[in-house]
C-alpha cells in the first residue's frame, strides 16, 4: 500500500465530484453534492492558502481525501473520506497513522469528529487509542492526547 497525501489540484474536480456525489459515501456527512457545490468545496477547502483537506492517492489514482487542519490551539482535526472501493481494506487505518504522525511532529494532539452512528470511524478511533470526549455540534468528538 503506497498511499500519497498531496495538495488538491484543480484537476481533482471530477474525482472529487464522483466521491462527494455518492449517497453511500455521504450518508453520515451531508446531502450528496452537485457539481457546483463540489467546485466550491474544492476551492474553499482544498485549494485554499491553508487547506482543510488534501487528496489521497494510491499509485497515482485518487482514492479520496483526508482532513487535516487546526482544531484548536493545541490540536489538529484529522479524518478521511474515501471512495467505497477502498473501504475495509486498511486505507483509513494507514491514513490515520500518517496524519497522527504529522500532528505529533507539529507537537499537536489529534481530534476526530464523526457522526455517532458512523460505526467504522468510531471503531477505528477507539482502536487507535482515541478517547470519547463528548458531543460538539451534533458530532462525537474523539481525542488522542
Task: Label every PLM stretch briefly.
Residues 22-23, 48:
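Acidic-histidine catalytic/liganding microenvironments
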Residues 1-14, 19-21, 55-145:
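Acyl-donor (CoA/ACP) binding surface of acyl/acetyltransferases
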Residues 27, 36, 49-53, 110:
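Secondary-structure transition/capping residues
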Residues 24-43:
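Conserved GNAT-fold acetyl-CoA-binding loop/helix
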Residues 35-39, 47-49, 84-85, 118:
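Juxtamembrane/interface motifs at transmembrane-helix termini
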Residues 33-35, 44-46, 81-83, 95-96:
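Short, charged/polar low-complexity linear motifs in solvent-exposed/disordered segments
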Amino acid at each position: 500500500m503506497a498511499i500519497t497525501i498531496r495538495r488538491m489540484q484543480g484537476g481533482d474536480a471530477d474525482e472529487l465530484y464522483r466521491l462527494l456525489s455518492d449517497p453511500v459515501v455521504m450518508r453520515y456527512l451531508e446531502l450528496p453534492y452537485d457539481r457546483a457545490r463540489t467546485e466550491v468545496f474544492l476551492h474553499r477547502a482544498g485549494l485554499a492558502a491553508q487547506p482543510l483537506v488534501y487528496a489521497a492517492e494510491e499509485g497515482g489514482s485518487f482514492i479520496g481525501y483526508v482532513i487535516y487542519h487546526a482544531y484548536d490551539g493545541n490540536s489538529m482535526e484529522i479524518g478521511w473520506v474515501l471512495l467505497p472501493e477502498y473501504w475495509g481494506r486498511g486505507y483509513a487505518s494507514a491514513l490515520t497513522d500518517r496524519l497522527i504522525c504529522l500532528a505529533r511532529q507539529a507537537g499537536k494532539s489529534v481530534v476526530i469528529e464523526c457522526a455517532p452512528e458512523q460505526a467504522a470511524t468510531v471503531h477505528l478511533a477507539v482502536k487507535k487509542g482515541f478517547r470519547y470526549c463528548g458531543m460538539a455540534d451534533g458530532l462525537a468528538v474523539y481525542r488522542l492526547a
